[in-house]
Amino acid sequence: MNCFLFTLFFVAAPLATASYGSSSGGGGGGSSYLSSASSNGLDELVQAAAGGAQQAGGTITPANAEIPVSPAEVARLNQVQAQLQALNSNPVYRNLKNSDAIAESLAESSLASKIRQGNINIVAPNVIDQGVYRSLLVPSGQNNHQVIATQPLPPIIVNQPALPPTQIGGGPAAVVKAAPVIYKIKPSVIYQQEVINKVPTPLSLNPVYVKVYKPGKKIDAPLVPGVQQNYQAPSYGGSSYSAPAASYEPAPAPSYSAAPAQSYNAAPAPSYSAAPAASYGAAPSASYDAAPAASYGAESSYGSPQSSSSYGSAPPASGY
């Protein structure tokens, strides 16, 4: 093995000396490790590849090695810099950059990527305002998240079990005060920031479909029945318009159909058919039939003692 390595070194040493030359042949500066023949061949290849536009290898310096920038490229770069400065000085862009919109989009992206692996909680806040729709994703565990919808976009369609659907739209901002509703949601399918879940409600076999849409779509917000009185308060803009619809429909229906029916059909019937029949049919017949018959019969009885005592009985008895 050692003999083979020695033979290989003995053959390769003259070839290396012939190709690269000795250290004294390259000059004291050591600027080139190639011989004159190899250097000339390399320059020819470079000139052929560059079309004669490339300088010789010995004349290239760091100063002339950079490619000069064209005037069109300089103008385009200046325009881009001007646009960037104008964008940074725009107050709308600064407000958007400093607002929660970026955090909201990141939260929705995180929701779209992680919701399939675990459960989330959708929390309806205590106050739902008719402003800009905002949703915030709060991680509550390794695979658990909370989506808090704070401000749905108008119009709001609120469906309650005991009330018809009420729409809050137009006018000033309407505030709906309700107790927080927390739903435990299983992994679901999301399409364009849209969550459709089938949530079983406590103490009920009927599921509730909760839809979380992106801004600009209708939101179905199921509220607990206990907030019905607070929602119909006339102090709020949207509730004051929907409360008369519930107050005018049940109240006049019993007042105009039940009460007049009893006042004009039941009460006059006993007053005009029962009382006059008893006053004109029973009392006059008893006063004109019984009383005169008794009075004339009594007079005949009064006359009978007279006829029996004085005219009929006494004289014949005394005469015979």
UniProtKB/Swiss-Prot annotation:
Entry keyword annotation includes Secreted: yes
Keyword Repeat assigned: yes
GO CC annotation terms, alphabetical: extracellular region
Main location: secreted
Alphabetically ordered keywords of this record: Repeat, Secreted, Signal
Region (Disordered): 259-320
Localization of this protein: Secreted
Signal peptide annotation: 1-18
Sequence repeat start-end pairs: 178-181, 258-261, 266-269, 274-277, 290
Top-level taxonomic group: Eukaryota
InterPro entries named among the record's database cross-references: Chorion_S36/S28 (IPR008449)
Entry remark concerning the domains of this protein: The tetrapeptide (A-A-P-[AV]) repeats found throughout the protein are also present in many proteins constituting the protective envelope of other species.
Protein family according to the UniProt entry: Belongs to the chorion protein S36 family.
Its biological purpose: Chorion membrane (egg shell) protein; plays a role in protecting the egg from the environment.
Protein name per the record: Chorion protein S36
